[in-house]
């Protein structure tokens, strides 16, 4: 079995609190599949900037969730450290990787991304992945921690995808506004009813996502060779829209064009899925682990009307439509 370190956490505004295999099967099925060429882009960058890393090579998977990125990193690194502030997520990830025979390579650590530097020594890692988590963090603190963990020439890879988007223009014109309404109505009560500390986190996250992570700064004394790859940047990266929020959304940018390279591509087939209404609905509902409890209280009755409207717009219960994603990938090298 893999090692597991523990640390309490009380600051999560989203977390699953019980290990339900059915929920996690649905969660992973409802997420986009990171393609092999996506991982190859990351690994090629890592090898080009770090041709002779210390051995054994160590990679961190920060905010591991159900552990699918940790599994992939096992192909490229001798040892993987997968961390998450939620003990349930770690239990899920460990169980899933035990089945695939990978746990002998993985150490599971219950800790927030910002506090990893209290668990692992400086310069102890060659690579660090932050998948679908950076906007949820205190970014300056997290980047300081990542810089602490990486040895010189080590690689940071941070990526995030947004809401699913109907890729065919005529379908998108009919269906996307309804899906956007469904997502906003689903999250409206969660966000507007959040306590002040969680509201601050939502605000920070929303600003970062509406900035397409352009507001994430990489200081010259710590990072070099910063690349920002964006797929479908004409689409919103934030899952929630303004109607779900009761605070101003303030995008910004701190990109330094003299030292950072931005590469953009409009690709309606990027990470393409073909979904029916059930699969679209599964994506939305897996975002909130307690959705069934809320539905049983009648909180989301008004959303059911919208789902019916979307089903009709898609062409019926069995109709399948092409789905794509807005995605950003940031690669940076430790000085």
Swiss-Prot record:
InterPro entries with a match to the protein in the record: Diverse_substrate_MTase (IPR051052), Methyltransf_11 (IPR013216), SAM-dependent_MTases_sf (IPR029063)
Keyword presence, Transmembrane helix: no
Regulation: induction: Expression is significantly up-regulated at the end of late growth phase, in the presence of Butyrolactone I. Expression is positively regulated by the pgm cluster-specific transcription factor pgmR.
Entry keyword set: Methyltransferase, S-adenosyl-L-methionine, Transferase
GO molecular function list: S-adenosylmethionine-dependent methyltransferase activity
Disruption phenotype: Does not affect the methylation of the naphthoquinones derived pigments and only abolishes the production of pleosporalin A but not of the 2 other final products.
Family, similarity comment: Belongs to the methyltransferase superfamily.
Designated name of the protein: Methyltransferase pgmE
Organism encoding this protein: Aspergillus terreus (strain NIH 2624 / FGSC A1156)
GN (gene name): pgmE
């Amino acid at each position: 079995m893999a090692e597991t370190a523990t640390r309490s956490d009380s600051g999560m505004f989203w977390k699953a609190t019980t290990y339900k295999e059915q929920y996690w099967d649905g969660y992973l099925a409802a997420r986009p599949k990171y393609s092999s060429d996506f991982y190859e882009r990351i690994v090629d960058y890592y090898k080009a900037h770090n041709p002779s890393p210390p051995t054994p090579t160590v990679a961190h998977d920060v905010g591991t969730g159900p552990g699918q990125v940790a599994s992939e990193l096992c192909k490229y690194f001798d040892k993987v450290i997968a961390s998450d502030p939620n003990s349930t997520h770690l239990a899920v990830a460990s169980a899933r990787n035990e089945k695939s025979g990978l746990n002998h390579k993985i150490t599971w650590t219950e800790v927030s991304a910002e506090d990893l530097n209290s668990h692992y020594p400086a310069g102890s890692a060659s690579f660090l992945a932050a998948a679908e988590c950076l906007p949820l963090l205190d970014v300056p603190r997290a980047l300081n921690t990542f810089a602490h963990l990486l040895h010189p020439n080590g690689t940071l890879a941070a990526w995030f995808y947004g809401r699913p988007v109907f890729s065919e223009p005529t379908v998108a014109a009919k269906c996307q506004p309804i899906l956007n309404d469904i997502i906003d109505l689903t999250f409206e009560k969660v966000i507007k009813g959040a306590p002040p500390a969680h509201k601050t986190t939502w605000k920070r996250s929303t600003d970062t996502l509406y900035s397409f992570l352009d507001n994430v700064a990489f200081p010259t004394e710590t990072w070099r060779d910063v690349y920002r790859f964006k797929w479908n940047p004409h689409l919103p990266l934030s899952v929630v829209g303004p109607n779900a929020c009761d605070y101003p959304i303030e995008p910004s940018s701190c990109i330094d064009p003299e030292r950072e390279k931005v590469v953009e591509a409009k690709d309606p087939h990027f990470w393409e899925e073909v979904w029916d209404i059930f699969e679209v609905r599964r994506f939305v509902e897996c975002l909130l682990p307690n959705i069934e409890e809320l539905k049983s209280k009648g909180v989301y009755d008004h959303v059911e009307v919208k789902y019916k409207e979307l089903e009709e717009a898609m062409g019926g219960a069995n109709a399948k439509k092409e789905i794509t994603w807005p995605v950003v990938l940031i690669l940076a090298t430790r000085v």
